[in-house]
UniProtKB/Swiss-Prot annotation:
Species this protein is from: Micromonospora sp. (strain ATCC 39149 / NRRL 15099 / SCC 1413)
Any one Gene Ontology BP term: antibiotic biosynthetic process
Protein name: L-evernosamine nitrososynthase
Pfam families: Acyl-CoA_dh_1, Acyl-CoA_dh_M, Acyl-CoA_dh_N
Gene that produces this protein: evdC
Function statement: Nitrososynthase involved in the biosynthesis of everninomicin, a broad spectrum orthosomycin antibiotic. Catalyzes the double-oxidation of TDP-L-evernosamine to TDP-L-evernitrosose. The enzyme first oxidizes the substrate to a transient hydroxylamino intermediate, which is then further oxidized to nitroso sugar. The nitroso group is probably spontaneously oxidized giving TDP-L-evernitrose. In vitro, catalyzes the double-oxidation of TDP-L-epi-vancosamine to TDP-L-epi-vancosonitrose.
Note: The nitrososynthase activity was originally established using as the substrate TDP-L-epi-vancosamine, which is a biosynthetic precursor to the expected substrate, TDP-L-evernosamine. The true substrate is presumably TDP-L-evernosamine, which differs from TDP-L-epi-vancosamine by 4-O-methylation.
Length: 421
């Protein structure tokens, strides 16, 4: 892992990666982006997942970009550089970037488990990381339960587990080989715990439903997955503690898992800006004052967006390697700037794309125009956890006002599901 103090930092505006591993990943992407960009419109129209692009990612080692070099990966550890790579890809196609983010995120979090987990967890993490580096494993996260469903683990009576439930919004699902499923389990005394079983795609009782018809991110393969008494080995279960424990230490892992996604929405906004400004410049003559005001506003907001995201990523990178001190404080120190940046992105990125439509005019108000796709894709950012807008308001206001609350959105969801059951 690189030493943060030994590098000369440049303006954190996501213009370029900062580490050799980051530059390697961006250079590899450059060879596949033209085809991804050329196919983006058709895949958006038909809602088809770019299987061929991910096959190419596997051949190039990009499915193991965030796997440690010692395990055969490209060794990309810097969150800033991961976000920069995602931004580049999202400028071509946000759906592909969203799906790839799922794999990159698992590489980052599994690396932590490999370095700091119990012996069985370290062994499981190493197996998966090596398979990811070899292009043989695509690992999804399955977090959100279908409405009215609680995904649960029950003992199989022989030391293992049986998983039943239904998850929605599972991106990259068409090619997934493994699913990290956020579930609940109940002890004999009735206490409820959070756990994450790792379920193989070929597990009995697992069904991937081809039913995605989203407003945006239409080629991201964001499907539903059904689990009907799927067997789970004891050594493929990650324990996440009791529901309602109020452990802010978990916010660190949630930040690492999700903060790089901000690069996707920065990429969408950048792509929209480039289309609109290119259109304006290509019309001939000097643009009218109103158009020039829009252009100046676009670039101003984009710079504010990129630098805010860059600052939050820089903070997260520094905190992620510092395991000294109070774990709960570390979690808040990572999550709070992340949420400042996410709130900023969720406000500015859609506004940038909206002004781009105004700049281009009625020509952009067609389903086939690239700004139409970007307009729909950018709205996905507001629904991503952690946190959605309402949850982010609760978290940030709670931090400012010193409120005593559970900041783990997975724990809060579990409590709500038990209350409504």
């Amino acid at each position: 892992m690189s030493n943060l103090t030994e590098e000369r930092w440049v303006a954190a505006d996501l213009r370029a990666p900062l580490t050799p591993a980051g530059r390697t990943v961006v250079d590899l992407l450059a060879g596949v982006i033209p085809r991804i960009s050329a196919e983006a419109a058709d895949r958006d129209r038909t809602g088809t997942f770019p299987v061929e692009a991910f096959e190419q990612f596997a051949k190039l080692g990009l499915m193991g970009a965030t796997v440690p070099a010692e395990l055969g990966g490209l060794g990309l550890t810097r969150l800033y550089d991961v976000a920069t790579a995602l931004m580049r890809l999202a400028e071509a196609d946000a759906s592909t970037a969203l799906a790839w983010h799922v794999q990159l995120s698992r590489g980052l979090t599994l690396t932590y488990e490999w370095q700091h987990g119990t012996p069985p967890v370290r062994a499981m993490a190493e197996r998966l990381l090596r398979a990811m580096a070899e292009g043989e494993a695509a690992v999804c996260g399955a977090l959100k339960d279908a409405p009215g469903v609680v995904t649960e683990l029950h003992s199989d009576g022989a030391g293992g587990w049986l998983l039943s439930g239904r998850k929605v919004l599972v991106s990259m699902a068409p090619i997934a080989t493994h699913f990290f499923v956020h579930a609940q389990r109940r002890d004999d005394d009735g206490s409820v715990f959070l756990a994450v079983p790792v379920v193989h795609r070929d597990a009995p009782g697992l069904t991937v439903l081809d039913n995605w018809d989203g407003l945006g991110m239409r080629a991201s393969g964001t499907l539903e997955v059904v689990f009907d008494r799927c067997p789970v080995r004891a050594d493929e279960l990650l324990e996440r503690g009791p529901v309602g424990a109020r452990r802010d230490a978990v916010l660190a892992g949630q930040t690492v898992s999700s903060i790089t996604m901000l690069g996707i929405y920065a990429g969408i906004a950048q792509a929209a800006r480039d289309i609109a400004v290119g259109f304006c410049a290509g019309r001939g003559g000097e643009p009218r004052a109103g158009a020039r005001a829009l252009v100046a506003g676009l670039d101003t907001r984009l710079y504010a967006l990129r630098t805010t995201v860059g600052a939050a990523l820089t903070n997260a990178d520094a905190a992620s390697v510092d395991l000294s001190g109070d774990p709960d404080e570390r979690g808040r120190r990572m999550m709070t700037p992340f949420q400042y940046a996410k709130m900023t992105v969720n406000e500015l990125a859609p506004a940038v794309v909206d002004d781009c439509l105004s700049l281009v005019g009625g020509l952009a108000y067609t389903a086939g125009h690239p700004l139409s796709r970007l307009y729909r894709d950018v709205r996905a950012g507001g629904f991503m956890q952690p946190y959605s807008y309402v949850d982010a308001v609760d978290y940030l206001s709670g931090q400012a006002l010193g409120l005593d609350r559970d900041n783990d959105y997975m724990s809060v969801r579990a409590l709500r599901s038990r209350t409504s059951a």
